[in-house]
Amino acid sequence: MNLIFCGMPGIGKTECVKFFSQYVPGNERVITIEDTMEIRYSVTNPGKDCIEMRVNDRFDYADAIKASLRLNPKWIMLSEARSKEVKYLLEGWSTGVRGMTTLHTDDVRNIPDRILNMLETRVDADRLENDIYQAMDVGVLIRKKKNGAGQVYRYIDPVSYTHLT
């Protein structure tokens, strides 16, 4: 199952990825790809099969996603989909690899359009539009509110299933 957690910056999307990652079976290889090590899969899930990749100027998200597919993963977790790397993530997910990622949008229904806008060219967008709906199983919107006492709480608002199988 591929999950995309969305919401505004600082809302707790990565924390949700960390929470749901504990339900990945321990014998399934997970590859995390991040620029800032936030998921810390090996810390939050000790003893599970994990390879943590850190991207930089010489080893970008596209390189990491391509390299990860050679390592026989069951899961690819991208800390945040921001730009053209989403193309490679979708291609990876289309091979049957499962995954989780986060992205910034204020409505779960905007996930497909947000992904299309991240792609470099209109040709990529046209070619990958169906892949988005095939690859994404669940979209989750995270919100936060303050209660009367001024305490902040976070909650999951709508959940969207793109297809049921």
Put a short name on every predicted segment:
Residues F5:
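Hydrophobic anchor at the beta1->P-loop junction of P-loop NTPases
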Residues P9:
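The conserved Walker
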Residues G12:
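Conserved glycine(s) of the Walker
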Residues N72-Y133, L141:
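Conserved P-loop NTPase nucleotide-binding/switch module
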Residues T162-T165:
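Conserved small/polar residues in nucleotide/adenosyl-binding loops
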Residues M1-N2:
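Pre-Walker A (Motif I) flank of P-loop NTPase domains
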Residues Q22-K66:
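P-loop NTPase switch/communication element
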Residues C16:
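Hydrophobic positions on the alpha1 helix immediately C-terminal to the Walker A/P-loop
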